[in-house]
Design a protein with these regions (language model features):
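A short, surface-exposed interaction/processing loop segment used at functional sites
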Residues: 31-46, 146-158, 234-262
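A contiguous strand-loop segment
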Residues: 7-88, 111, 115-116
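Short beta-strand scaffold segments in enzyme catalytic cores
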Residues: 9-15, 120-125, 130-132, 217-220
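Flexible, glycine-rich surface segments
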Residues: 145-207, 211-214
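Compact, glycine/acidic-enriched structural inserts
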Residues: 83-112
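Extended amphipathic alpha-helical segments with heptad-repeat/coiled-coil character used for oligomerization
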Residues: 126, 131-150
């Protein structure tokens, strides 16, 4: 397993034009020995309730009570922008705590003088607005959603020639979405999740015998506040949450993937992904 493969991630923000429903999917690929978990923070006077997933007290992605979703993915390293830098704290948690829309998230990035030089970020909200934020060439680049979908992989959309492109996983997701839309079938969270069938990575060892692959895949119905997470590509043991209920709780929750009580669910189709 090549290091860049182990670090590969796939993110989708999708709006069903027939129903207006909004979905988000993320496949987090990394080394499988990390202590990954879900963190749910309760609402307070100045902070929104929010759920994020990641490890080492750092949010890799998540969503808050207002339906603001974010995720990040590694990209080829770029020159740092003068006066800006990478975050020194849990940036994702801070954004989910304080922002309710894509525009507000962008304002926080600017206020905090954040310019990631080794990754980019996708933000999407409940209104149907979404953007991928990238930094290179001394400035911030915004790739706004221009139809009903936004896909993020590990290459810079504003500068694909920088590396990690072309990407067959990116092409596969786009192709499967096009097939789904042209089929005339009703679109739901399960079918949107199926577009990641070739984007996930089964466990494989690298030259140092360290296992890498898809740690978890999250499926979010932003409109209806539904959250499903598959750990290590399991289609039987799932974390299934009603976000409205979880965000109404008054205490912090931490769900470690190795110890959490999973739900066994018979799905309408055989696989989520």
């Amino acid at each position: 397993l090549h290091p860049t493969q182990a670090l590969s991630c796939s993110v989708l923000y999708y709006k069903d034009l027939s129903t207006g429903k909004i979905y988000a999917v993320n496949a987090e690929d990394y080394y499988l020995d990390v202590d990954a978990y879900i963190q749910i923070e309760p609402k307070s006077k100045r902070k929104f309730a929010r759920l994020w997933y990641g490890w080492d007290d750092f949010a890799q992605g998540g969503i808050n009570e207002h339906g603001l979703f974010f995720d990040a993915a590694i990209t080829p390293e770029q020159q740092k922008i003068k006066g800006y830098g990478n975050p020194r704290n849990n940036l994702g948690d801070k954004i989910l705590a304080l922002a309710s829309t894509v525009e507000e998230a962008l304002e926080i990035l600017e206020k905090e003088k954040i310019a990631l030089n080794k990754s980019h970020m996708l933000f999407g909200d409940r209104t149907g607005q979404a953007v991928i934020v990238e930094w290179f060439g001394g400035e911030r680049k915004l790739r706004w959603i221009d139809d009903n979908k936004l896909v993020m992989k590990n290459f810079l959309l504003s500068k694909p020639e920088a590396g990690n492109h072309p990407d067959f996983r990116y092409n596969s997701i786009i192709h499967r979405i096009n097939e789904l839309e042209s089929s005339g079938q009703e679109i739901n969270l399960n079918k949107i999740g199926n577009t990641f069938g070739l984007a996930v990575q089964p466990a494989r060892a690298d030259k140092n015998k360290r296992l890498g692959g898809t740690i978890y895949t999250s499926f979010i119905d932003i409109t209806d506040n539904k959250f499903v997470l598959s750990y290590r590509l399991s289609n039987d043991d799932l974390v299934i949450l009603d976000l409205k209920e979880e965000f109404a709780r008054s205490k912090r929750q931490t769900m470690n993937f190795e110890t959490v009580s999973y739900t066994h669910l018979t799905l309408p189709t055989k696989r989520i992904v």
